[in-house]
Amino acid sequence: MAHSQVAYLIPLKADLKEDNSSPRITLSEGPNIIGRGNVSIVDKRLSRKHITIIVSTSGSASLSVDGTNPVVIRSSGDGERKKVKPSEEVSVCNDDLIELIPGHHFFKLVLLNGRAAKKARKAEDDVEAIRRFCPPNEKLPSTFRLLSVDALPDWANTSCVSINDVIEGDVVAAILSNYMVDIDWLMSACPKLANIPQVMVIHGEGDGRQEYIQRKKPANWILHKPRLPISFGTHHSKAIFLVYPRGVRVVVHTANLIHVDWNNKSQGLWMQDFPWKDDDKDPPKGCGFEGDLIDYLNVLKWPEFTANLPGRGNVKINAAFFKKFDYSDATVRLIASVPGYHTGFNLNKWGHMKLRTILQECIFDREFRRSPLIYQFSSLGSLDEKWLAEFGNSLSSGITEDKTPLGPGDSLIIWPTVEDVRCSLEGYAAGNAIPSPLKNVEKPFLKKYWARWKADHSARGRAMPHIKTFTRYNDQKIAWFLLTSSNLSKAAWGALQKNNSQLMIRSYELGVLFLPSPIKTQGCVFSCTESNPSVMKAKQETKDEVEKRSKLVTMTWQGDRDLPEIISLPVPYQLPPKPYSPEDVPWSWDRGYSKKDVYGQVWPR
Protein backbone atom coordinates (compact mmCIF):
# COMPACT_ATOMS: atom_id res chain seq x y z
CA MET A 1 0.00 0.00 0.00
CA ALA A 2 1.25 3.50 -0.80
CA HIS A 3 2.79 5.33 2.17
CA SER A 4 1.88 8.83 1.00
CA GLN A 5 -0.03 10.25 -1.92
CA VAL A 6 1.89 13.18 -3.37
CA ALA A 7 0.37 13.59 -6.84
CA TYR A 8 -2.33 12.40 -9.20
CA LEU A 9 -3.13 12.20 -12.90
CA ILE A 10 -6.40 13.71 -14.13
CA PRO A 11 -7.81 11.98 -17.25
CA LEU A 12 -8.71 14.49 -19.98
CA LYS A 13 -10.91 14.37 -23.05
CA ALA A 14 -9.56 15.25 -26.50
CA ASP A 15 -10.61 18.88 -25.88
CA LEU A 16 -8.43 18.78 -22.72
CA LYS A 17 -11.42 19.09 -20.37
CA GLU A 18 -11.54 16.69 -17.42
CA ASP A 19 -13.05 13.29 -18.28
CA ASN A 20 -15.35 12.61 -15.33
CA SER A 21 -16.23 9.15 -16.64
CA SER A 22 -12.73 7.88 -15.76
CA PRO A 23 -11.19 7.84 -12.27
CA ARG A 24 -8.17 9.90 -11.31
CA ILE A 25 -4.92 7.97 -10.86
CA THR A 26 -3.26 8.53 -7.51
CA LEU A 27 0.55 8.71 -7.40
CA SER A 28 2.48 7.90 -4.25
CA GLU A 29 5.97 8.82 -3.15
CA GLY A 30 8.46 6.82 -5.23
CA PRO A 31 7.89 4.96 -8.52
CA ASN A 32 4.38 4.61 -9.99
CA ILE A 33 3.75 2.34 -12.99
CA ILE A 34 1.07 3.48 -15.46
CA GLY A 35 -0.19 1.36 -18.34
CA ARG A 36 -3.14 -0.06 -20.22
CA GLY A 37 -4.87 -1.06 -16.97
CA ASN A 38 -5.28 2.63 -16.13
CA VAL A 39 -7.14 3.48 -19.34
CA SER A 40 -10.81 2.65 -19.92
CA ILE A 41 -10.44 2.27 -23.71
CA VAL A 42 -8.73 -0.80 -25.13
CA ASP A 43 -5.61 0.23 -27.09
CA LYS A 44 -2.99 -2.38 -27.99
CA ARG A 45 -0.41 0.37 -28.46
CA LEU A 46 -0.36 0.79 -24.68
CA SER A 47 1.91 -1.54 -22.73
CA ARG A 48 0.98 -2.96 -19.35
CA LYS A 49 4.01 -1.10 -18.02
CA HIS A 50 3.89 1.93 -20.31
CA ILE A 51 5.51 4.66 -18.21
CA THR A 52 6.97 5.07 -14.73
CA ILE A 53 6.50 8.35 -12.85
CA ILE A 54 8.76 8.88 -9.83
CA VAL A 55 7.46 11.52 -7.42
CA SER A 56 9.08 13.00 -4.32
CA THR A 57 7.47 14.76 -1.36
CA SER A 58 9.39 17.91 -2.30
CA GLY A 59 7.23 18.34 -5.41
CA SER A 60 9.65 17.10 -8.06
CA ALA A 61 8.86 14.30 -10.51
CA SER A 62 10.39 12.41 -13.42
CA LEU A 63 8.88 10.26 -16.17
CA SER A 64 10.50 7.34 -17.99
CA VAL A 65 9.05 5.43 -20.95
CA ASP A 66 8.96 1.66 -20.41
CA GLY A 67 6.77 0.67 -23.37
CA THR A 68 7.57 0.37 -27.06
CA ASN A 69 5.80 3.58 -28.14
CA PRO A 70 6.83 7.19 -27.45
CA VAL A 71 5.03 9.51 -25.04
CA VAL A 72 4.44 13.25 -25.45
CA ILE A 73 4.88 15.78 -22.62
CA ARG A 74 3.25 19.19 -23.14
CA SER A 75 4.87 21.79 -20.87
CA SER A 76 2.57 23.78 -18.59
CA GLY A 77 4.97 26.72 -18.94
CA ASP A 78 5.36 27.40 -22.66
CA GLY A 79 3.05 24.74 -24.11
CA GLU A 80 5.91 23.05 -25.97
CA ARG A 81 5.28 19.41 -26.92
CA LYS A 82 8.25 17.12 -26.36
CA LYS A 83 8.35 13.51 -27.57
CA VAL A 84 9.94 11.09 -25.09
CA LYS A 85 11.22 7.90 -26.69
CA PRO A 86 11.31 4.41 -25.14
CA SER A 87 13.93 4.08 -22.35
CA GLU A 88 14.29 7.89 -22.08
CA GLU A 89 13.68 9.76 -18.81
CA VAL A 90 12.66 13.44 -18.39
CA SER A 91 11.64 15.77 -15.59
CA VAL A 92 7.96 16.71 -15.40
CA CYS A 93 6.30 19.62 -13.63
CA ASN A 94 2.98 20.45 -12.04
CA ASP A 95 0.16 20.85 -14.61
CA ASP A 96 2.18 19.26 -17.44
CA LEU A 97 0.02 17.32 -19.91
CA ILE A 98 0.97 13.73 -20.76
CA GLU A 99 -0.13 11.97 -23.96
CA LEU A 100 0.42 8.24 -23.38
CA ILE A 101 0.22 7.78 -27.15
CA PRO A 102 0.90 10.96 -29.19
CA GLY A 103 -2.50 12.59 -29.71
CA HIS A 104 -4.32 10.03 -27.50
CA HIS A 105 -4.95 9.23 -23.81
CA PHE A 106 -4.41 12.66 -22.25
CA PHE A 107 -3.60 13.16 -18.57
CA LYS A 108 -2.78 16.22 -16.50
CA LEU A 109 -0.14 15.83 -13.77
CA VAL A 110 -0.99 17.52 -10.44
CA LEU A 111 1.78 17.61 -7.81
CA LEU A 112 0.73 18.14 -4.20
CA ASN A 113 2.39 19.63 -1.17
CA GLY A 114 1.41 20.75 2.33
CA ARG A 115 -2.32 20.96 3.00
CA ALA A 116 -3.24 19.64 -0.45
CA ALA A 117 -1.17 16.51 0.13
CA LYS A 118 -2.82 15.90 3.51
CA LYS A 119 -6.27 16.27 1.97
CA ALA A 120 -5.27 13.97 -0.87
CA ARG A 121 -4.00 11.33 1.56
CA LYS A 122 -7.44 11.35 3.20
CA ALA A 123 -8.98 10.85 -0.24
CA GLU A 124 -6.50 8.06 -0.94
CA ASP A 125 -7.48 6.33 2.31
CA ASP A 126 -11.07 6.42 1.08
CA VAL A 127 -10.14 5.16 -2.38
CA GLU A 128 -8.24 2.22 -0.95
CA ALA A 129 -10.76 1.35 1.77
CA ILE A 130 -11.35 -2.10 0.28
CA ARG A 131 -7.64 -2.87 0.90
CA ARG A 132 -8.19 -2.55 4.64
CA PHE A 133 -11.51 -4.39 4.83
CA CYS A 134 -10.40 -7.48 6.77
CA PRO A 135 -13.03 -8.17 9.44
CA PRO A 136 -11.99 -10.68 12.13
CA ASN A 137 -13.67 -14.09 12.11
CA GLU A 138 -15.99 -13.27 14.99
CA LYS A 139 -17.45 -10.32 13.06
CA LEU A 140 -17.90 -12.07 9.69
CA PRO A 141 -21.47 -13.31 10.40
CA SER A 142 -22.48 -9.72 11.21
CA THR A 143 -21.29 -8.25 7.92
CA PHE A 144 -21.25 -9.25 4.26
CA ARG A 145 -18.63 -9.65 1.56
CA LEU A 146 -18.36 -8.45 -2.02
CA LEU A 147 -17.78 -11.00 -4.75
CA SER A 148 -14.38 -11.01 -6.45
CA VAL A 149 -14.15 -9.26 -9.83
CA ASP A 150 -11.78 -10.85 -12.35
CA ALA A 151 -10.54 -7.66 -14.00
CA LEU A 152 -9.53 -5.96 -10.74
CA PRO A 153 -6.11 -6.14 -9.05
CA ASP A 154 -5.69 -8.46 -6.06
CA TRP A 155 -5.85 -5.63 -3.53
CA ALA A 156 -9.31 -4.67 -4.82
CA ASN A 157 -10.56 -8.18 -3.98
CA THR A 158 -9.38 -8.13 -0.36
CA SER A 159 -11.76 -10.25 1.77
CA CYS A 160 -13.95 -10.80 -1.30
CA VAL A 161 -15.26 -14.26 -2.11
CA SER A 162 -15.83 -16.58 -5.06
CA ILE A 163 -18.20 -19.53 -5.37
CA ASN A 164 -15.47 -21.95 -4.25
CA ASP A 165 -15.06 -20.01 -1.00
CA VAL A 166 -18.72 -20.70 -0.28
CA ILE A 167 -19.30 -24.27 -1.48
CA GLU A 168 -16.45 -26.07 0.29
CA GLY A 169 -15.74 -28.88 2.70
CA ASP A 170 -17.62 -32.14 3.29
CA VAL A 171 -21.09 -31.07 2.13
CA VAL A 172 -23.62 -33.93 2.26
CA ALA A 173 -26.61 -32.06 0.79
CA ALA A 174 -27.01 -28.73 -0.99
CA ILE A 175 -29.94 -26.55 -2.00
CA LEU A 176 -29.14 -23.86 -4.57
CA SER A 177 -31.88 -21.26 -4.90
CA ASN A 178 -31.68 -18.81 -7.80
CA TYR A 179 -33.32 -17.19 -10.82
CA MET A 180 -30.92 -17.99 -13.69
CA VAL A 181 -28.79 -21.15 -13.76
CA ASP A 182 -26.03 -21.96 -16.26
CA ILE A 183 -25.42 -25.62 -15.51
CA ASP A 184 -22.29 -25.84 -17.69
CA TRP A 185 -20.62 -22.87 -16.00
CA LEU A 186 -21.71 -24.00 -12.53
CA MET A 187 -20.14 -27.46 -12.86
CA SER A 188 -16.88 -26.08 -14.29
CA ALA A 189 -16.61 -23.16 -11.84
CA CYS A 190 -17.37 -25.32 -8.80
CA PRO A 191 -16.18 -28.92 -9.37
CA LYS A 192 -16.97 -29.62 -5.71
CA LEU A 193 -20.66 -29.86 -6.64
CA ALA A 194 -20.03 -33.12 -8.51
CA ASN A 195 -19.06 -34.80 -5.22
CA ILE A 196 -22.09 -33.74 -3.18
CA PRO A 197 -24.46 -36.74 -2.81
CA GLN A 198 -27.71 -34.74 -2.95
CA VAL A 199 -28.21 -31.41 -4.75
CA MET A 200 -31.48 -29.57 -5.32
CA VAL A 201 -31.72 -26.54 -7.61
CA ILE A 202 -34.67 -24.23 -6.98
CA HIS A 203 -34.84 -21.92 -9.99
CA GLY A 204 -36.86 -19.41 -11.96
CA GLU A 205 -35.90 -20.39 -15.52
CA GLY A 206 -38.41 -20.58 -18.38
CA ASP A 207 -39.55 -23.85 -19.93
CA GLY A 208 -36.87 -23.93 -22.66
CA ARG A 209 -33.99 -23.37 -20.27
CA GLN A 210 -35.52 -25.75 -17.76
CA GLU A 211 -35.54 -28.55 -20.33
CA TYR A 212 -31.88 -27.84 -21.15
CA ILE A 213 -30.87 -27.95 -17.48
CA GLN A 214 -32.83 -31.17 -17.05
CA ARG A 215 -30.80 -32.78 -19.84
CA LYS A 216 -27.43 -31.47 -18.64
CA LYS A 217 -27.70 -31.92 -14.88
CA PRO A 218 -26.10 -34.84 -13.00
CA ALA A 219 -28.44 -37.73 -12.27
CA ASN A 220 -28.50 -37.07 -8.51
CA TRP A 221 -29.66 -33.46 -8.93
CA ILE A 222 -33.29 -32.47 -8.42
CA LEU A 223 -34.87 -29.44 -10.12
CA HIS A 224 -37.75 -27.50 -8.60
CA LYS A 225 -39.52 -24.38 -9.86
CA PRO A 226 -41.83 -22.94 -7.19
CA ARG A 227 -45.41 -22.17 -8.11
CA LEU A 228 -46.10 -18.65 -9.41
CA PRO A 229 -49.81 -18.04 -8.77
CA ILE A 230 -49.83 -14.42 -9.98
CA SER A 231 -48.84 -13.41 -13.51
CA PHE A 232 -45.52 -11.65 -14.19
CA GLY A 233 -43.93 -13.09 -11.06
CA THR A 234 -40.53 -14.80 -10.89
CA HIS A 235 -38.55 -16.97 -8.50
CA HIS A 236 -35.79 -14.41 -7.97
CA SER A 237 -34.32 -15.38 -4.56
CA LYS A 238 -30.60 -16.13 -4.45
CA ALA A 239 -29.52 -18.37 -1.59
CA ILE A 240 -27.48 -21.49 -0.85
CA PHE A 241 -28.11 -23.99 1.95
CA LEU A 242 -25.30 -26.47 2.62
CA VAL A 243 -25.76 -29.35 5.07
CA TYR A 244 -22.60 -30.66 6.77
CA PRO A 245 -22.01 -33.36 9.38
CA ARG A 246 -21.42 -30.50 11.87
CA GLY A 247 -24.24 -28.15 10.92
CA VAL A 248 -25.65 -25.98 8.16
CA ARG A 249 -24.31 -23.04 6.17
CA VAL A 250 -26.88 -20.41 5.15
CA VAL A 251 -25.88 -18.09 2.31
CA VAL A 252 -27.85 -15.12 0.96
CA HIS A 253 -26.41 -13.32 -2.06
CA THR A 254 -27.24 -11.32 -5.20
CA ALA A 255 -25.65 -13.24 -8.11
CA ASN A 256 -27.34 -15.48 -10.66
CA LEU A 257 -25.57 -18.80 -11.17
CA ILE A 258 -23.92 -17.58 -14.37
CA HIS A 259 -20.35 -16.58 -15.27
CA VAL A 260 -20.76 -12.81 -15.66
CA ASP A 261 -22.51 -12.44 -12.30
CA TRP A 262 -19.70 -14.14 -10.34
CA ASN A 263 -16.81 -12.54 -12.25
CA ASN A 264 -17.63 -9.13 -13.76
CA LYS A 265 -20.13 -7.32 -11.56
CA SER A 266 -20.49 -5.67 -8.18
CA GLN A 267 -22.27 -8.27 -6.02
CA GLY A 268 -22.76 -9.00 -2.32
CA LEU A 269 -22.92 -12.17 -0.20
CA TRP A 270 -23.62 -12.99 3.44
CA MET A 271 -23.13 -16.37 5.06
CA GLN A 272 -23.06 -17.96 8.49
CA ASP A 273 -22.62 -21.50 9.80
CA PHE A 274 -24.97 -22.87 12.48
CA PRO A 275 -24.54 -26.01 14.62
CA TRP A 276 -27.03 -28.79 15.22
CA LYS A 277 -29.25 -28.31 18.25
CA ASP A 278 -28.08 -30.39 21.21
CA ASP A 279 -30.63 -33.16 21.83
CA ASP A 280 -29.40 -33.57 25.43
CA LYS A 281 -30.14 -29.97 26.36
CA ASP A 282 -33.28 -27.91 26.46
CA PRO A 283 -33.88 -26.54 22.97
CA PRO A 284 -32.70 -22.94 22.59
CA LYS A 285 -35.39 -20.31 22.72
CA GLY A 286 -36.74 -19.61 19.24
CA CYS A 287 -35.19 -16.60 17.55
CA GLY A 288 -36.37 -14.23 14.86
CA PHE A 289 -33.94 -15.56 12.28
CA GLU A 290 -35.22 -19.13 12.64
CA GLY A 291 -38.82 -18.00 12.24
CA ASP A 292 -37.92 -15.94 9.17
CA LEU A 293 -36.11 -18.87 7.58
CA ILE A 294 -38.66 -21.61 8.28
CA ASP A 295 -41.59 -19.42 7.21
CA TYR A 296 -39.89 -18.81 3.87
CA LEU A 297 -38.75 -22.40 3.24
CA ASN A 298 -42.24 -23.71 4.01
CA VAL A 299 -43.69 -21.72 1.12
CA LEU A 300 -41.24 -23.14 -1.46
CA LYS A 301 -42.79 -26.64 -1.18
CA TRP A 302 -39.92 -28.50 -2.85
CA PRO A 303 -40.22 -32.26 -3.32
CA GLU A 304 -38.88 -33.87 -0.16
CA PHE A 305 -35.69 -35.88 -0.64
CA THR A 306 -33.53 -38.08 1.57
CA ALA A 307 -29.89 -37.55 2.51
CA ASN A 308 -27.60 -39.87 4.44
CA LEU A 309 -25.97 -37.87 7.24
CA PRO A 310 -22.97 -39.29 9.12
CA GLY A 311 -24.08 -40.39 12.58
CA ARG A 312 -27.72 -39.56 11.86
CA GLY A 313 -28.65 -41.97 9.10
CA ASN A 314 -31.20 -41.20 6.41
CA VAL A 315 -32.88 -37.87 6.99
CA LYS A 316 -35.72 -36.26 5.05
CA ILE A 317 -34.71 -32.85 3.72
CA ASN A 318 -37.76 -30.60 3.89
CA ALA A 319 -38.49 -27.22 5.44
CA ALA A 320 -38.99 -28.75 8.91
CA PHE A 321 -35.50 -30.30 8.70
CA PHE A 322 -33.98 -26.83 9.07
CA LYS A 323 -35.50 -26.54 12.56
CA LYS A 324 -32.79 -28.96 13.72
CA PHE A 325 -30.13 -26.23 13.81
CA ASP A 326 -29.36 -23.66 16.48
CA TYR A 327 -29.67 -20.15 15.01
CA SER A 328 -29.39 -18.29 18.33
CA ASP A 329 -26.08 -16.65 17.32
CA ALA A 330 -27.63 -14.97 14.26
CA THR A 331 -27.41 -11.18 14.48
CA VAL A 332 -29.30 -10.59 11.23
CA ARG A 333 -32.90 -11.01 10.09
CA LEU A 334 -34.28 -12.33 6.82
CA ILE A 335 -36.66 -10.25 4.71
CA ALA A 336 -38.47 -12.46 2.20
CA SER A 337 -41.20 -12.00 -0.38
CA VAL A 338 -43.50 -14.76 -1.60
CA PRO A 339 -46.28 -14.44 -4.19
CA GLY A 340 -49.85 -14.08 -3.04
CA TYR A 341 -52.53 -11.83 -1.61
CA HIS A 342 -51.44 -11.57 2.03
CA THR A 343 -53.95 -10.54 4.70
CA GLY A 344 -54.38 -10.72 8.47
CA PHE A 345 -51.32 -12.09 10.29
CA ASN A 346 -49.57 -12.72 6.97
CA LEU A 347 -49.79 -9.05 5.98
CA ASN A 348 -46.66 -8.28 8.01
CA LYS A 349 -44.71 -11.47 7.17
CA TRP A 350 -43.49 -10.53 3.70
CA GLY A 351 -42.11 -7.76 1.52
CA HIS A 352 -41.87 -4.16 2.64
CA MET A 353 -44.42 -4.77 5.41
CA LYS A 354 -42.06 -7.32 6.98
CA LEU A 355 -39.25 -4.76 6.85
CA ARG A 356 -41.58 -2.13 8.33
CA THR A 357 -42.57 -4.47 11.18
CA ILE A 358 -38.98 -5.32 12.14
CA LEU A 359 -37.79 -1.70 11.96
CA GLN A 360 -40.72 -0.60 14.13
CA GLU A 361 -39.39 -2.88 16.88
CA CYS A 362 -35.85 -1.45 16.71
CA ILE A 363 -34.29 1.37 18.68
CA PHE A 364 -31.82 3.54 16.77
CA ASP A 365 -29.45 6.35 17.75
CA ARG A 366 -30.87 9.87 17.64
CA GLU A 367 -28.53 10.83 14.81
CA PHE A 368 -30.71 8.78 12.43
CA ARG A 369 -33.82 10.91 12.96
CA ARG A 370 -34.94 12.03 9.50
CA SER A 371 -31.65 10.78 8.07
CA PRO A 372 -31.48 9.94 4.34
CA LEU A 373 -32.41 6.65 2.66
CA ILE A 374 -30.72 4.90 -0.27
CA TYR A 375 -32.42 2.62 -2.80
CA GLN A 376 -29.83 0.81 -4.95
CA PHE A 377 -30.75 -1.99 -7.36
CA SER A 378 -30.37 -3.16 -10.97
CA SER A 379 -33.90 -3.25 -12.39
CA LEU A 380 -36.60 -0.61 -12.04
CA GLY A 381 -40.27 -1.55 -12.10
CA SER A 382 -43.15 0.60 -13.29
CA LEU A 383 -43.59 2.90 -10.31
CA ASP A 384 -45.88 5.73 -9.26
CA GLU A 385 -45.53 8.36 -6.57
CA LYS A 386 -48.21 6.80 -4.37
CA TRP A 387 -46.42 3.46 -4.13
CA LEU A 388 -43.02 5.10 -3.63
CA ALA A 389 -44.49 6.95 -0.63
CA GLU A 390 -45.89 3.66 0.71
CA PHE A 391 -42.49 2.04 0.33
CA GLY A 392 -40.74 5.03 1.92
CA ASN A 393 -43.06 4.85 4.94
CA SER A 394 -41.93 1.29 5.60
CA LEU A 395 -38.24 2.14 5.29
CA SER A 396 -38.64 5.19 7.54
CA SER A 397 -39.88 3.08 10.48
CA GLY A 398 -38.05 2.85 13.80
CA ILE A 399 -37.75 4.87 17.00
CA THR A 400 -35.05 6.40 19.19
CA GLU A 401 -34.50 5.58 22.88
CA ASP A 402 -36.99 8.27 23.92
CA LYS A 403 -39.65 6.63 21.67
CA THR A 404 -39.45 9.42 19.08
CA PRO A 405 -40.13 8.09 15.57
CA LEU A 406 -37.20 8.36 13.18
CA GLY A 407 -39.54 9.93 10.65
CA PRO A 408 -39.13 10.21 6.89
CA GLY A 409 -35.81 11.09 5.30
CA ASP A 410 -34.84 12.21 1.83
CA SER A 411 -34.49 9.27 -0.56
CA LEU A 412 -32.04 8.84 -3.42
CA ILE A 413 -31.88 6.12 -6.09
CA ILE A 414 -28.36 5.01 -7.04
CA TRP A 415 -28.52 4.06 -10.71
CA PRO A 416 -25.82 3.85 -13.41
CA THR A 417 -25.73 6.51 -16.11
CA VAL A 418 -25.30 5.74 -19.79
CA GLU A 419 -21.65 6.83 -19.47
CA ASP A 420 -21.13 4.49 -16.51
CA VAL A 421 -22.30 1.55 -18.60
CA ARG A 422 -20.40 2.62 -21.74
CA CYS A 423 -17.10 2.89 -19.86
CA SER A 424 -17.66 -0.17 -17.65
CA LEU A 425 -15.56 -3.35 -17.59
CA GLU A 426 -18.08 -4.98 -19.94
CA GLY A 427 -18.96 -1.91 -21.99
CA TYR A 428 -22.55 -1.69 -23.18
CA ALA A 429 -22.92 -5.46 -22.61
CA ALA A 430 -23.21 -4.68 -18.89
CA GLY A 431 -26.55 -3.06 -19.71
CA ASN A 432 -28.06 -6.50 -20.34
CA ALA A 433 -28.13 -6.96 -16.57
CA ILE A 434 -29.65 -3.50 -15.94
CA PRO A 435 -32.86 -4.36 -17.83
CA SER A 436 -35.10 -1.36 -17.36
CA PRO A 437 -37.02 0.18 -20.26
CA LEU A 438 -37.26 3.84 -21.10
CA LYS A 439 -40.92 4.01 -20.02
CA ASN A 440 -39.95 3.05 -16.45
CA VAL A 441 -36.72 5.04 -16.17
CA GLU A 442 -37.73 8.38 -17.65
CA LYS A 443 -40.82 9.14 -15.58
CA PRO A 444 -40.56 12.84 -14.68
CA PHE A 445 -41.18 12.37 -10.95
CA LEU A 446 -38.06 10.16 -10.66
CA LYS A 447 -35.64 12.92 -11.74
CA LYS A 448 -35.20 14.26 -8.22
CA TYR A 449 -34.12 10.84 -6.93
CA TRP A 450 -31.27 9.96 -9.30
CA ALA A 451 -27.75 9.61 -7.85
CA ARG A 452 -24.49 8.35 -9.34
CA TRP A 453 -22.91 4.92 -8.98
CA LYS A 454 -19.55 6.11 -7.59
CA ALA A 455 -17.40 3.34 -6.14
CA ASP A 456 -13.74 4.42 -6.09
CA HIS A 457 -13.20 3.28 -2.49
CA SER A 458 -14.23 -0.28 -3.40
CA ALA A 459 -12.49 -0.14 -6.83
CA ARG A 460 -15.84 -1.04 -8.39
CA GLY A 461 -16.65 2.12 -10.31
CA ARG A 462 -16.44 0.17 -13.58
CA ALA A 463 -17.93 -3.09 -12.24
CA MET A 464 -21.59 -2.45 -12.89
CA PRO A 465 -23.90 -3.22 -9.96
CA HIS A 466 -26.06 -6.30 -9.85
CA ILE A 467 -26.03 -6.00 -6.06
CA LYS A 468 -29.25 -4.69 -4.49
CA THR A 469 -29.13 -2.72 -1.25
CA PHE A 470 -31.39 -0.46 0.77
CA THR A 471 -30.12 1.52 3.74
CA ARG A 472 -30.56 4.44 6.12
CA TYR A 473 -27.40 6.33 7.00
CA ASN A 474 -25.84 9.46 8.48
CA ASP A 475 -22.48 10.25 6.88
CA GLN A 476 -20.49 6.98 7.31
CA LYS A 477 -22.69 5.56 10.07
CA ILE A 478 -25.50 3.19 9.17
CA ALA A 479 -28.81 2.71 10.99
CA TRP A 480 -29.63 -0.51 9.13
CA PHE A 481 -28.64 -2.14 5.85
CA LEU A 482 -30.47 -4.64 3.64
CA LEU A 483 -28.67 -6.86 1.10
CA THR A 484 -31.33 -8.46 -1.06
CA SER A 485 -32.44 -9.96 -4.36
CA SER A 486 -35.27 -7.40 -4.48
CA ASN A 487 -35.20 -4.68 -7.10
CA LEU A 488 -37.35 -1.58 -6.73
CA SER A 489 -40.70 -2.89 -7.93
CA LYS A 490 -44.18 -3.67 -6.66
CA ALA A 491 -43.70 -7.26 -7.86
CA ALA A 492 -40.74 -7.71 -5.49
CA TRP A 493 -41.81 -5.69 -2.45
CA GLY A 494 -45.59 -5.90 -2.66
CA ALA A 495 -48.28 -3.24 -2.97
CA LEU A 496 -50.97 -2.55 -0.38
CA GLN A 497 -54.57 -2.99 -1.53
CA LYS A 498 -58.10 -2.88 -0.09
CA ASN A 499 -57.55 0.07 2.24
CA ASN A 500 -54.14 -1.28 3.32
CA SER A 501 -55.58 -4.61 4.53
CA GLN A 502 -53.94 -6.72 1.80
CA LEU A 503 -50.43 -6.93 0.36
CA MET A 504 -50.10 -8.27 -3.18
CA ILE A 505 -46.68 -9.73 -4.11
CA ARG A 506 -45.83 -11.42 -7.42
CA SER A 507 -42.32 -12.79 -6.88
CA TYR A 508 -40.09 -14.77 -4.54
CA GLU A 509 -37.27 -12.66 -3.05
CA LEU A 510 -34.84 -13.00 -0.15
CA GLY A 511 -32.64 -10.51 1.68
CA VAL A 512 -30.58 -10.23 4.86
CA LEU A 513 -31.08 -7.26 7.19
CA PHE A 514 -28.17 -5.93 9.26
CA LEU A 515 -29.24 -4.17 12.46
CA PRO A 516 -27.62 -2.89 15.64
CA SER A 517 -27.72 -5.94 17.92
CA PRO A 518 -26.57 -6.90 21.43
CA ILE A 519 -22.96 -8.05 21.68
CA LYS A 520 -23.47 -11.32 23.56
CA THR A 521 -20.01 -12.83 23.22
CA GLN A 522 -16.62 -11.96 21.89
CA GLY A 523 -14.63 -14.32 19.73
CA CYS A 524 -17.67 -16.54 19.17
CA VAL A 525 -17.21 -18.52 15.98
CA PHE A 526 -18.81 -21.70 14.70
CA SER A 527 -17.62 -23.27 11.48
CA CYS A 528 -18.85 -26.28 9.54
CA THR A 529 -15.51 -26.58 7.75
CA GLU A 530 -12.71 -25.57 10.16
CA SER A 531 -10.84 -28.32 12.01
CA ASN A 532 -11.79 -26.62 15.29
CA PRO A 533 -15.47 -25.91 14.66
CA SER A 534 -16.21 -23.76 17.68
CA VAL A 535 -14.15 -21.19 19.52
CA MET A 536 -15.83 -19.37 22.36
CA LYS A 537 -14.54 -16.61 24.62
CA ALA A 538 -17.04 -15.70 27.27
CA LYS A 539 -17.73 -12.04 27.70
CA GLN A 540 -16.82 -10.69 31.12
CA GLU A 541 -19.91 -9.16 32.61
CA THR A 542 -20.60 -7.19 35.75
CA LYS A 543 -23.92 -6.64 37.47
CA ASP A 544 -24.10 -3.00 36.49
CA GLU A 545 -22.83 -3.44 32.96
CA VAL A 546 -25.01 -1.91 30.29
CA GLU A 547 -25.47 -4.28 27.37
CA LYS A 548 -23.50 -2.93 24.43
CA ARG A 549 -25.04 -2.87 21.00
CA SER A 550 -23.22 -3.09 17.73
CA LYS A 551 -22.75 -0.02 15.56
CA LEU A 552 -22.78 -0.31 11.77
CA VAL A 553 -20.33 1.78 9.74
CA THR A 554 -19.00 1.92 6.17
CA MET A 555 -15.48 0.95 5.06
CA THR A 556 -14.51 4.64 4.91
CA TRP A 557 -15.56 5.44 8.49
CA GLN A 558 -12.57 7.04 10.22
CA GLY A 559 -12.98 5.61 13.74
CA ASP A 560 -11.45 2.61 15.50
CA ARG A 561 -12.70 -0.52 13.70
CA ASP A 562 -11.11 -2.79 16.31
CA LEU A 563 -13.70 -1.87 18.94
CA PRO A 564 -15.88 -4.95 19.55
CA GLU A 565 -19.10 -3.05 18.89
CA ILE A 566 -18.03 -1.72 15.47
CA ILE A 567 -19.30 -3.71 12.48
CA SER A 568 -17.84 -2.47 9.20
CA LEU A 569 -19.96 -3.12 6.11
CA PRO A 570 -18.35 -3.08 2.63
CA VAL A 571 -20.90 -0.70 1.14
CA PRO A 572 -19.54 -0.57 -2.41
CA TYR A 573 -20.86 2.87 -3.38
CA GLN A 574 -20.05 6.36 -2.13
CA LEU A 575 -22.06 7.77 0.77
CA PRO A 576 -23.46 10.37 0.59
CA PRO A 577 -24.04 9.72 -3.10
CA LYS A 578 -23.55 12.38 -5.75
CA PRO A 579 -26.82 13.51 -7.38
CA TYR A 580 -27.02 13.45 -11.17
CA SER A 581 -25.75 16.51 -13.04
CA PRO A 582 -27.89 17.99 -15.86
CA GLU A 583 -25.71 16.08 -18.35
CA ASP A 584 -26.21 12.66 -16.72
CA VAL A 585 -28.66 10.31 -18.41
CA PRO A 586 -30.00 7.25 -16.54
CA TRP A 587 -29.37 3.95 -18.30
CA SER A 588 -32.29 2.29 -20.07
CA TRP A 589 -31.71 -0.80 -22.14
CA ASP A 590 -34.18 -0.22 -24.97
CA ARG A 591 -32.66 3.07 -26.15
CA GLY A 592 -30.00 3.24 -28.88
CA TYR A 593 -26.52 4.61 -28.12
CA SER A 594 -24.23 5.47 -31.03
CA LYS A 595 -21.19 6.57 -29.01
CA LYS A 596 -18.82 3.58 -28.98
CA ASP A 597 -18.02 1.80 -25.73
CA VAL A 598 -14.60 0.66 -24.47
CA TYR A 599 -14.72 -2.27 -26.93
CA GLY A 600 -15.67 -0.11 -29.91
CA GLN A 601 -19.29 -1.32 -29.85
CA VAL A 602 -22.56 0.62 -30.09
CA TRP A 603 -25.90 -0.31 -28.49
CA PRO A 604 -27.81 -2.33 -29.43
CA ARG A 605 -25.19 -4.47 -31.16
UniProtKB/Swiss-Prot annotation:
Motif (Nuclear localization signal): 81-86
Annotated region (Interaction with DNA), positions in chain: 379-382
Binding site for substrate: K238, K468
Disruption phenotype: Developmental defects, including loss of apical dominance, early flowering and dwarf phenotype, when homozygous. Hypersensitivity to camptothecin and failure of DNA damage repair resulting in progressive cell death. No visible phenotype when heterozygous.
GO CC annotations, alphabetized: nucleus
EC number(s) on file: 3.1.4.-
Entry annotation: catalytic residues: H236 (nucleophile), H466 (proton donor/acceptor)
Alphabetized InterPro entries for the sequence: SMAD_FHA_dom_sf, Tdp1
Tissues where the protein occurs: Ubiquitous, with a low level in roots.
Transmembrane stretches, start-end: none
Gene Ontology process terms (BP): DNA repair
An example molecular function term from Gene Ontology annotations: exonuclease activity
Keywords of this entry: DNA damage, DNA repair, Exonuclease, Hydrolase, Nuclease, Nucleus
Compartments where found: Nucleus
Regulation: Inhibited by vanadate analogs.
Family matches, as Gene3D superfamilies: 2.60.200.20, Endonuclease Chain A (3.30.870.10)
Site (Interaction with DNA): S489
Role: DNA repair enzyme that can remove a variety of covalent adducts from DNA through hydrolysis of a 3'-phosphodiester bond, giving rise to DNA with a free 3' phosphate. Catalyzes the hydrolysis of dead-end complexes between DNA and the topoisomerase I active site tyrosine residue.
Protein name as catalogued: Tyrosyl-DNA phosphodiesterase 1
The organism of origin for this protein: Arabidopsis thaliana (Mouse-ear cress)
